[in-house]
């Protein structure tokens, strides 16, 4: 499995006229499409992982009770196992614009995509997914697995993600996902010390990441009038660090 395969599947959704209403809708359809691929053996949704050393896998296999109440759990949207025994991790984001819009889906009729806005926060969260995928082989899953590649995916009808450099916000300037910019790498600063921003720790990316946006090419009549925005999507490939 590779980035081109994911792009092909998502392009197929557009060709079939699929309009998603939320992230869970998108996640389920992508999981189903991946499961139907010849080279895919299994797909796990919302796979939990824990810090190394939080519990002993052999003890659990032998029936020893364990608790995860006080350890930092993380959930990966999709873990894909291919027929050659390799594992891949996918993190998804589906983000609406700053107002709700109604679309026509070939499969379900009218579909409402509600507003999200907050592009700065959500761009941070997308890059945090990239950071988590870099570190994923330092996590402990219920099965002793090693992730071969990670993929961070964003599908949106908000053009600010692909066009804005966040130039009006010194706080989030380094978190723009705009295409064509210099590769993201290293420490990404958050230029504010206000209390409401303290929950957002600066990210430090090991890899170098550029953002190649793709149009999600629905038929023109999917947009009920010319004021309704189209969709675009981003697939970023991540090499997990060895631990």
Ranges and model annotations:
Residues 19-29, 42-47, 143-150:
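Short glycine-rich, low-complexity/disordered patches
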Residues 94-161:
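Catalytic cores of nucleic-acid endonucleases
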Residues 1-39:
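Interdomain/boundary linker segments immediately adjacent to catalytic/signaling cores
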Residues 144-147, 151, 155-243:
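Non-catalytic C-terminal interaction segments of nucleic acid-processing enzymes
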Residues 70-73, 226-228:
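A short catalytic or substrate-binding loop motif that flags glycine-/basic-rich loops and adjacent residues
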């Amino acid at each position: 499995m590779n980035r081109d395969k994911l792009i092909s599947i998502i392009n197929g959704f557009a060709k079939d006229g699929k309009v998603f209403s939320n992230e869970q809708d998108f996640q389920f359809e992508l999981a189903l499409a991946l499961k139907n691929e010849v080279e895919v053996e299994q797909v796990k949704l919302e796979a939990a992982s824990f810090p190394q050393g939080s519990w002993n896998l052999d003890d659990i296999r032998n029936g020893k009770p364990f608790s995860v109440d006080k350890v930092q759990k993380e959930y990966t949207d999709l873990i894909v196992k291919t027929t050659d025994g390799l594992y891949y991790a996918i993190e998804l984001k589906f983000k609406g614009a700053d107002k709700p819009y109604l679309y026509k889906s070939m499969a379900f009729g009218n579909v409402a995509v509600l507003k999200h806005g907050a592009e700065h926060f959500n761009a941070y969260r997308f890059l945090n997914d990239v950071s988590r995928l870099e570190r994923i082989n330092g996590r402990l899953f219920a099965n002793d697995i090693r992730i071969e590649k990670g993929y961070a995916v964003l599908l949106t009808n908000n053009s600010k993600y692909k066009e804005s450099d966040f130039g009006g916000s010194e706080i989030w300037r380094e978190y723009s996902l705009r295409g064509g910019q210099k590769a993201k790498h290293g420490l990404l600063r958050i230029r504010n010390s206000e209390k409401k921003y303290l929950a957002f720790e600066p990210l430090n990316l090991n890899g170098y990441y550029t953002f190649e946006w793709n149009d999600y090419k629905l038929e023109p009549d999917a947009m009920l009038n010319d004021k309704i925005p189209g969709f675009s999507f981003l697939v970023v490939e991540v090499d997990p660090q060895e631990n």
